[in-house]
């Protein structure tokens, strides 16, 4: 019965979830069909809206902190209405997960398509995708929003070949405001120099990222992808703008387009509106030229799913036979919680969206920067000394934290010193421990003994900080449950 429903067109188009739907449990409004993939921020599922029959994508994100900020950013998403931007329908709070209901793009991301086909895109294909992407950026920038996470993994295609921007602000803000996972390091490969340097940035930061994305689509990965992210942090602001590995393979128009995007000075960088008039984009062909590569990618995906399903069925049979021989009772092996197969990848590039692969370089860098009405006369450029300064990039926070931890650990193990009060101890700057040579053994031993109370004090401070963040979330969960019970 469900199969028949899926084959029929939607009874009416879903524009957004009404208040009645939002007060229900999400399982009453949607049938979850299968798991599409995972990102650093959570899992993505394909689902069907029961009332309209429309297919949607649902991101299930574990919420661990700053719930009010997340809700505020999601409400801003409702302002966006463009055919070149993935639509946001609404959100639910269930247990400790946030369910974000968004438009489903059946072909997946551009990076998914490159990975599945195991080949890069042609200039014609790139031009068509860039044209739609620029229209999406023009809309966002007109709305005075900065995406800050433009890359092939965040450009989705529907089955007709229409490109749409995804994860603008929602996933970016979620990953910025949630508790960070130690295994995740934001990659700076797509980021504009001014964003890395934190010297102030505006909408054209997205244009730099678009130029990097153009190279990514042409060559399969962004510049500097083969080096450590920490090294790239310093190379992007200091080195000349990156270019193609083999410039002779590409047309003058394409080369010039990328050059216009990758101008290090934000003031001299082209805008989305200007780039829509560039010869490379103006000569772009219709979306129909993307249908062949979409069909090819979807065929590969289907064959992999069928192959993996056969393997799962075979494993189930073998496990069942073993169980029957051991106990005389047939026991069917338990599958995953959704009863579906997750597709593995042959290539990884750090894409982080509605994906069918594991990320080796997941991105935490997307952040929507919203300007209030009071700031309109001042423009969108943000400086460090302003009240609403840009959030520190996640990768910088990560590396700074690791550096502090390394300094504390190495100092605590081998170089303690004699201070009467443990609170007076300062971490030596620039690894300068020469002064320890003048201390006596007794002084060094006193310093060592003082470390344990310091550690206990720091642990208690961390516990109190965690509790202060945890309690509002628990209160919000309880309030949400009471509200649902009232209906």
Curated annotation (Swiss-Prot):
Phosphothreonine modification, residue list: 3, 183, 340, 367, 387
This protein's UniProt keywords: Acetylation, Apoptosis, ATP-binding, Coiled coil, Cytoplasm, Kinase, Magnesium, Metal-binding, Nucleotide-binding, Nucleus, Phosphoprotein, Serine/threonine-protein kinase, Transferase
Protein name (Swiss-Prot/TrEMBL): Serine/threonine-protein kinase 4
Cofactor: Mg(2+)
Sequence ranges assigned to domain SARAH in this UniProt record: 433-480
Chain segments annotated as coiled-coil in the UniProt record: 290-310
Assembly: Homodimer; mediated via the coiled-coil region. Interacts with NORE1, which inhibits autoactivation. Interacts with and stabilizes SAV1. Interacts with RASSF1. Interacts with FOXO3. Interacts with RASSF2 (via SARAH domain). Interacts with AR, PKB/AKT1, TNNI3 and SIRT1. Interacts with DLG5 (via PDZ domain 3). Interacts with MARK3 and SCRIB in the presence of DLG5.
Record Pfam families: Mst1_SARAH (PF11629), Pkinase (PF00069)
């Amino acid at each position: 019965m469900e199969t028949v429903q899926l084959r029929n067109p939607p009874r009416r188009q879903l524009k957004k979830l009404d208040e009645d739907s939002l007060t229900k449990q999400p399982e009453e409004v949607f049938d979850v069909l299968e798991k599409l993939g995972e990102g650093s921020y959570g899992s993505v599922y394909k689902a069907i809206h029961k009332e309209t029959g429309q297919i949607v994508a649902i991101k299930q994100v574990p919420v661990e902190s700053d719930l009010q900020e997340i809700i505020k950013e999601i409400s801003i998403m409702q302002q966006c209405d463009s055919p070149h931007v993935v639509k946001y329908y609404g959100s639910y709070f269930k247990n400790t997960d946030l369910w974000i209901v968004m438009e489903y793009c059946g072909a997946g991301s551009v990076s998914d398509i490159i990975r599945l086909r195991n080949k890069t895109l042609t200039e014609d294909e790139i031009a068509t995708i860039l044209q739609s992407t620029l229209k999406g950026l023009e809309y966002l920038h007109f709305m005075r929003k900065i995406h800050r996470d433009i890359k092939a993994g965040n450009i989705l295609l529907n089955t007709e070949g229409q490109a749409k921007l995804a994860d603008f602000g929602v996933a970016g803000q979620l990953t910025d405001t949630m508790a960070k996972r130690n295994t995740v390091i934001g990659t700076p490969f797509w980021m504009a120099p001014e964003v890395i340097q934190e010297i102030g940035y505006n909408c054209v930061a997205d244009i730099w990222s678009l130029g990097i994305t153009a190279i990514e689509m042409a060559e399969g990965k962004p510049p500097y992808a083969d080096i450590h992210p920490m090294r790239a942090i310093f190379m992007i602001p200091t080195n000349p703008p990156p270019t193609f590995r083999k410039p002779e393979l590409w047309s003058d128009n394409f080369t010039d387009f990328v050059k216009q995007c990758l101008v290090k000075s934000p003031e001299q960088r082209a805008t989305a509106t200007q780039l829509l008039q560039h010869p490379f984009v103006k000569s772009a062909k219709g979306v129909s030229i993307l249908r062949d590569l979409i069909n090819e990618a979807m065929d590969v995906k289907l064959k992999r799913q069928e192959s993996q399903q056969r393997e799962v069925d075979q494993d189930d049979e073998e496990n069942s036979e073993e169980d029957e021989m051991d106990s005389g009772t047939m026991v069917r092996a338990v599958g995953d919680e959704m009863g579906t197969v997750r597709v593995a990848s042959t290539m990884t590039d750090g894409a982080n969206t509605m994906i069918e692969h594991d990320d080796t370089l997941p991105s935490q860098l997307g952040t929507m920067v919203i300007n209030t009405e009071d700031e309109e006369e001042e423009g969108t450029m943000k400086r460090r000394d302003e009240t609403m300064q840009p959030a520190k990039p996640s990768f910088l926070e990560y590396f700074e934290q690791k550096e502090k931890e390394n300094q504390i650990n190495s100092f605590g193990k081998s170089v303690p010193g004699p201070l009467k009060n443990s609170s007076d101890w300062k971490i030596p700057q620039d690894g300068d421990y020469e002064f320890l040579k003048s201390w006596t053994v007794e002084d060094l031993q006193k310093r060592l003994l003082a470390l344990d109370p310091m550690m206990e004090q720091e642990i208690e401070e961390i516990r109190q900080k965690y509790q202060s963040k945890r309690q509002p979330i628990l209160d919000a969960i309880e309030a949400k449950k009471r509200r649902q019970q009232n209906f």
